Amino acid sequence: MWLHTGPFCIHPRPLLVSDSAVSSFIPAPLRCGRFELTFERPLVMGILNATPDSFSDGGRFLARDDALRQAERMIADGVDLIDIGGESTRPGAPPVPLDEELARVIPLVEALRPLNVPLSIDTYKPAVMRAALAAGADLINDIWGFRQPGAIDAVRDGNSGLCAMHMLGEPQTMQVGEPRYGDVVTDVRDFLAARAQALRDAGVAAERICVDPGFGFGKAVVDDNYALLAALPDTAPARPDGRAYPILAGMSRKSMLGAVIGGKPPMERVAASVAAALCAVERGAAIVRVHDVAATVDALKVWNAVRAAARQ
């Protein structure tokens, strides 16, 4: 859930994941620009790719009017946040020139801001971060974990939410060969802890930070990704107050799903994507990043109804 920030803000009861072994994993609230995200239920982040070459929907929403219609459709379907991307980060994707990325995403931020839904920008470029925040973005979602020179300086001030993701390597080469880890869960958690600490050392409040284990980004397609999903609560480092940083999980239509459902192409991975989202929220994910908003929202309504009945 999101609430407008102001002089006062009431925090509803936080999410209790389940009565299972992960029931003590309670996401802390996340400050997110104009909003405060209070996770008494998991939130759905809808993907809006203003790109010609994204692995699943490349080219469908490159035109501004098409992108705006898709955003309005997601809002009607019950989306909680919209994540706007102007550069594909699929394995092997080439970088996009700065001016081109700005031209793709900034007009969308400006056009969507009046719709009163939290807006996230999927970028690793400091100049895009600055421009997006100036245009009214509420969250910066960085696959590089704010490791690019100038990235932390670009986001240090203000109240925007910041999502630091784990990636081994870089998009062009991250899936070349088999990624190697000592222990993937420990390695990912240690990396995310270091990135959160780097942000905090620069003066960023812990309440602005969330983390993403980076499914599909420099991970063995089956072994690493499913190990991370199975142990999802263990990937989140602790904040100074002892609560876990909120987890954003993005598995929608990815190859880790295709690999276990007979190699179906991305557009035929909807059911698998919804199943993965449910597995993630059962294991404590605060936000799931998805292409298929309506299906995910409906599935989570059923999941929440079961949880409510179990509490009675």
What are these model-predicted stretches?
Residues 73-85:
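Catalytic domains of carbohydrate-active enzymes, especially glycoside hydrolases
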Residues 24-27, 39, 56-70, 89-110, ...:
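Active-site-adjacent loop and "lid" segments of alpha/beta metabolic enzymes
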Residues 205-208:
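Short acidic capping loops at alpha-helix termini that bridge into adjacent secondary structure
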Residues 16-49:
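N-terminal amphipathic alpha-helix/helix-capping segment at the start of soluble metabolic enzymes
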